[in-house]
């Protein structure tokens, strides 16, 4: 049986949750088919596998100025006319017209492409399952917005307030129409059950083929971080850098015996490197 998956990102981009889900679905006899946004990233290229994927590209410009102008245009069109969701729904509809599907799964860290999934589920009378990896309410500030508006501070706050309201309204409308909702922690479950009581917990995990319990002695002490850093508001590595700096200053560690390994995307790396500039820790880090 085929399952159509709509998601905001999918391998080779930074989308391990859906990437691994597709891997296990195929083993269980399901046929996942994915529609996702085209993102220039190859962090999880090894996870794409044999899953058929339709990539929808919203951004075509080259050069920083044109890219910024294009982003503003897409943002305005999407805010007023659901541009991205309509384009995603159109790509998904073409696939649904070609064969039978048992249902639709939509995974998002914010809201997009939930309205698209809600629309095609209603149009084709298919059950909808929504998976939310992150939600707007968990962020300390406006880290869920990919780009700063960079206008006047008071205007930025107003735009952010209006944008947040729209994100939550669209998300909650889709949640109410879903047959099932899954999310990543008990706190998320509690928040989302207010909009859909059929909300269940599915933790993020590790592929047992790559990570499994093992005991062995090594020549290095390694601290490993896997994931993304959107800002320093909720995940601040400077406390770690301060501790490492102190241990280095007291000559209790050296780079041959102590390493910090980061498995992150390019945006996260830039945040980490910027935060590390005030500390003598670069020689301890690997990316």
Language model: regions and residue ranges:
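Conserved nucleotide-sugar donor-binding subdomain of glycosyltransferases
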Residues: 67-113, 157-168
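Carbohydrate-associated surface elements
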Residues: 184-187, 205
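Acidic anion/phosphate-binding donor-loop and adjacent secondary structure
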Residues: 193, 206-220
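Nucleotide-activated donor-binding/catalytic signature segment of Leloir-type glycosyltransferases, i.e.
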Residues: 252-264, 269-287
